[in-house]
Amino acid sequence: MMSTNYLFVAFLVVASVNAQFDKANFGEPKICKPFRCSKGQEPVPKWPYKVKSMGCSSSMGGMMAMTPGKSDGPDPLEDCCHAKAACLQTCGSVKHLCQEQFMKCGEATCAAIADPKASDDCSKPLELQKIMSSLDNCNEYDNYQRQNCKCVDEDEAQKERVKFVTRFYEKYNPEDVGKAKKLAAKADTVRKMATLVTKLAVKYPKCIKIIEDPNKAYMDKIMKEANEKKEDDDDEDSAAEDLGTEEL
């Protein structure tokens, strides 16, 4: 298992390259300005809805593999991480609220695990992820918003919302496309629409394209090499212990 000291050093390396480090807000969500349009216009989500997720590893640059207690099995937080990715990439979302929703999802997921040790292991990455989020800058979020929002005249915004939700249902749940207009009618503001679209993404995860995080592959390689070296060292120690004094 990776030592706590090694984890801390790795964390400091990541922190040291982040230009947005702020001691006063250490561990607090980064506040980024929501996407805005020119006066007389509102942002609405572009179609097709394009969301990609690298899972939990993307939030920590592949460092999830180094978290103490991390097993090789399925990550119980993975759905929460995919939901966070969808939230950040949805037009009109608010970055720190996406992080808050992720923490609530993670805490509820870990609390629902019956085995105390497994529940504790599940919770360990949450605080690290919270710190990493506070060190993050707004660039990635801003890029997502620019890519996935389009500005339309205010009197056309609601029509565009209805059109988006209708297309979403046509693609991911055509049997219930009749719900689209009613749901869109409730999402009559930028924030409400972002909330609706994020909920749709969570309910219909096929709309999220899962991709591999290159940083995770790199960290997995480091962990594998470290474990192999430890096994070799243990074998050498065992061989040395087997050498009795009578053989000298």
Regions found by a protein language model. Name each.
Residues 18-248:
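Extended terminal accessory/targeting regions
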Residues 3-19:
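Cleavable N-terminal signal peptides of Sec/SRP-targeted secreted and luminal proteins
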Residues 2-3, 224:
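Position-driven detector of the extreme protein N-terminus
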